[in-house]
Amino acid sequence: MATSSQLNLESGLEQSIIHIPKWSGPKHVKLLVTTKIGGHSKPPYNSWNLAEHVNDDLSSVRSNRQLLSQQISKLPFFLNQIHSTEVVSLTQPWKNQEPAPTADGVISVLDSHYLAILTADCLPILLCDDKGEIVAACHAGWRGLANGIIQNTIRAMVEFIKPNSKQHFIEGLHAYIGPAISQKNFEVGREVKECFMQNKLIGVESINDCFTPNDEPDKYFADLFGLATEILNQLGVHQVHTERQCSYNNSEHFYSYRREKTTGRFASCIWLE
């Protein structure tokens, strides 16, 4: 299981706090998770909201994104996330004024940009190969998990690299699962479990293990971390790192849509140094 360290950054307002996950990936592949603390946004988005689609003041969001880019010293690459299974490839430098592509996964071999996934309960999943030649990031709520966003992201990595051995390449992948809502706080209906059953991305026993029945009929508590880990393992990815940090419980550091509805988004980032 990964551990993390915390850094305090001087933002000119209050100290911005970021988390640096520790994992077994190549040393020149870097990870960073932002928090709520230390940005320019006013309540209810206070204060380091990085999402443009939540009705926050756009000038505040741009200042918050600039703060993040200054810390990483790379150009940003964000997605217009819509709970899809679409994956895009970043093959040339992205101009900051261009609209973000509509997708929920991205791969890149460029060392000029960082990839950022915005969440407030969904899973951010960051990936790289064992040599550190390619990085990827995807946004995975229950719909994305059930419909194959992880599979599509890894498929895009394989198709870009064209390794001699597809399975050997996949087995060498490293995955980091960032903060998201924990099972005890994520109640879902029967239709969510049925979606996983119908799509058969993992076995029935694994699905049952990730859905704990609630006292109410046709209600379950779903384990997004467990589902993502099972999917990755099924594909052959066993170097999976997560701290299982709960975005719902940790109101000091993370935004949570289930907790607050009108709220911001934090970012999980990966890049090649």
Regions from the language model: what does each represent?
Residues 1-273:
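Active-site microenvironment for binding and transforming phosphate-containing groups
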